[in-house]
C-alpha cells in the first residue's frame, strides 16, 4: 500500500448494516468498517478477542451481567469467549479489529451472518 486509507471515503461506499467490510490487513488481523443500528444477536468468539473503535455515533456492548457504553472516539476490547451483543439507538459507524476469518455472528449464526471476506 502506498497511500493512506481514508475511512470516511470507505464508509461512503456502502449502506448495508451489520455487514463488516475489510479495509486493511496487518499480519493475521483484519481492520473492518461496519455500520449498524438496532440490536445484534447474542454470540461469542471462543478463540479471539474483538475490538470495537467507534468512529461516529454511540453504541452499547451488552454482556449478560452489565452493559458498556462506547462513544465516538472510544474503543473497547471484548475478551475471547465472552458472550455479548451490540446495539445502537441511531446508526453507529465503527472499526473492528479481529483475526482474519472471524465471523461477525460468532457461534450464533443466523440471518445476520455476513460474508467474512468483503473488501472495499
Sequence positions of predicted segments:
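Double-stranded beta-helix
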Residues: 3-11, 24, 85, 89-120
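A short glycine-rich, His/Asp/Glu-containing loop-to-beta-strand
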Residues: 7-42, 48, 97
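A cytosolic small-molecule/anion-sensing beta-strand core signal
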Residues: 27, 55-56, 71-72, 90
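Short acidic/polar mixed-charge low-complexity motifs
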Residues: 29-30, 59, 66, 82
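Glycine- and acidic-residue-biased ligand/ion/polar-headgroup-sensing regions
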Residues: 36-38, 47-60, 64-65
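Short beta-strand His + acidic residue motifs that chelate non-heme Fe in jelly-roll/DSBH
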Residues: 43, 61-62, 78, 83-89, ...
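Short acidic-glycine-tyrosine-enriched beta hairpin
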Residues: 64-80
Amino acid at each position: 500500500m502506498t497511500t493512506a486509507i481514508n475511512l470516511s471515503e470507505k464508509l461512503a461506499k456502502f449502506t448495508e448494516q451489520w455487514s463488516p467490510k475489510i479495509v486493511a490487513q496487518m499480519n493475521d488481523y483484519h481492520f473492518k468498517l461496519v455500520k449498524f443500528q438496532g440490536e445484534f444477536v447474542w454470540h461469542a468468539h471462543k478463540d479471539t478477542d474483538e475490538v470495537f473503535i467507534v468512529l461516529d455515533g454511540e453504541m452499547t456492548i451488552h454482556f449478560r451481567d452489565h452493559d458498556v457504553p462506547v462513544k465516538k472516539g472510544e474503543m473497547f476490547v471484548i475478551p475471547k469467549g465472552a458472550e455479548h451483543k451490540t446495539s445502537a439507538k441511531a446508526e453507529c459507524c465503527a472499526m473492528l479489529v479481529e483475526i482474519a476469518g472471524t465471523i461477525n455472528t460468532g457461534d450464533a449464526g443466523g440471518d445476520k451472518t455476513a460474508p467474512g471476506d468483503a473488501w472495499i
